[in-house]
């Protein structure tokens, strides 16, 4: 269970660019 359902959680570029998913 990570941010955006990706292993890197919010540290990945996609999640940094889409912070609202957190």
UniProtKB/Swiss-Prot annotation:
Disulfide bonds join 3-15, 4-21, 10-22. Expressed by the venom duct. Coiled coil: none annotated. The modification Pyrrolidone carboxylic acid is found at residue 1. GO terms for molecular function: sodium channel regulator activity; toxin activity. Its main location: secreted. It is found in: Secreted. Belongs to the conotoxin M superfamily. This is Mu-conotoxin MIIIA.
């Amino acid at each position: 269970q990570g941010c955006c359902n990706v292993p890197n959680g919010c540290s990945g570029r996609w999640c940094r660019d889409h912070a609202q998913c957190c």
